[in-house]
Curated annotation (Swiss-Prot):
Any GO BP annotation: base-excision repair
EC annotation from Swiss-Prot or TrEMBL: 3.2.2.-
Any GO molecular function: alkylbase DNA N-glycosylase activity
InterPro entries: Formyl_transferase-like_C_sf, MPG, MPG_sf
Protein's recorded name: Putative 3-methyladenine DNA glycosylase
Provenance organism: Latilactobacillus sakei subsp. sakei (strain 23K)
Key words of the record: DNA damage, DNA repair, Hydrolase
A family per Pfam: Pur_DNA_glyco
Origin superkingdom: Bacteria
Enzyme class: hydrolase
Family from the record: Belongs to the DNA glycosylase MPG family.
Amino acid sequence: MTTIQPAPMAFFTNRPTTEIARDLLGTHLLYTSHQGTLGGLIVETEAYMGAQDTAAHAYNGRRTPFSEPLYHEPGTIYIYQLRSFFLFDIVTQAVDQPQGVLIRAIEPTHGLAQMQRNRPNKPSVNLTNGPGKLMGALGIHDKQLTFKNVATAPLTIDLANRRQPRHITTAPRIGVNAKAASGQLPYRYFITGNPYVSGTLKKDWDREQHGWL
């Protein structure tokens, strides 16, 4: 692998958050810690559109200590807890425009053995095929990286070694209120046929190329 190129703040602004969510597919999510560098190719994302999005933490301009990171500069890390899981959201758009992208799944490429130790007895795709699962595999179990920026943090997006998807599927987001105004909007993006996408059926997997060109 060539030198890592962390995504700059400019990557996360000056275009729609939906476009950013699509563009993150095929980039590497990497985390460097005492365990080494762990991570993989991003294969599934969800866009959250801020104050007008009924599924967003900042819906109606809600601003609390919990959601404060969303109001910071583009590329800010927003880690939050959902039950026993920690989830990773990247802030998009300019300061005080609280939009973001949730990283839902990755295909492991770095430190697979260590990720398997971090999530023992989770074979094959179950290791990282969900937003909480991938964070556990990376060994992230707290919010300490929140407010840091992926441009300089040990948790980063590598733009230099990306892969191109053959096809991207759009769909409604998972786990949101489907009856709310934004509930059925197609703000979820994933690599068609990739086995690590959450909730996919084995019959739909591309077992040879995993959906990559």
